[in-house]
Amino acid sequence: EAIAASKYDRAVECIAAQDYKTAWELLDGMEYKDSGEKQKSIKPQYYRALLTKAAVGDTVFFGSYEQDNETSNGKEDIEWLVLAKENNRLLVVSQYGLDCQQYNTSETEVTWENCTLREWLNEDFFHAAFSDGEKAMIPTVTVSADKNPDCDTEPGESTQDKVFLLSVTEANRYFKNGEERVCGSTAYAKANGVYAANDYTTESGVAACWWW
């Protein structure tokens, strides 16, 4: 009891000093007073501290989304791969296929600008995956309407988004080959109908999914 009280008091001091990383680690797993609620309350600040120190190639956790398809135990933290860092802003991509959605719900010619997937990512997914504090950390950026280098298709107009898909150009830039681009899907995504190639798996043996 005395040890827990000492750790709790130190965590409170760290929060007051804005040392959220140390405070989080002190509160983690603690069952004392309101330690669980206090840890939850500093989650955005803790993530910000980790994100500030993240480098290209690191994995970071940010936001939460149903992944194990066991809704009774709540959402799981989302794991992201850092692709680029500039002026303390990170470009990240999910390590796993999180859901299965159509690019567009109707069979018509459409670009990223007008597809239903763009709306779903920036509305449904955005509000489901991130808390208010986390949303405040996600900037709106210009997504350039780059022409597909392999197909003569109309790219549409550039957009302003918070969540978006990598373009073919970006996928080729940040991942050198198809093997590096292999991505496994979550149990939740599989339950929602994601296509998984059982003959092509990730290093951990998870069936690869189509994501770009």
Indicate residue ranges for each PLM-predicted region.
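Collagenous Gly-X-Y triple-helix signature in extracellular proteins
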Residues: 47-212
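Alpha-helix N-cap/N′ positions at the starts of helices
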Residues: 2-10, 18
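Residue-level detector of conserved, well-ordered beta-strand and adjacent loop positions
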Residues: 12, 36, 83
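Short, charge-rich amphipathic alpha-helical segments embedded
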Residues: 3, 20, 24-46
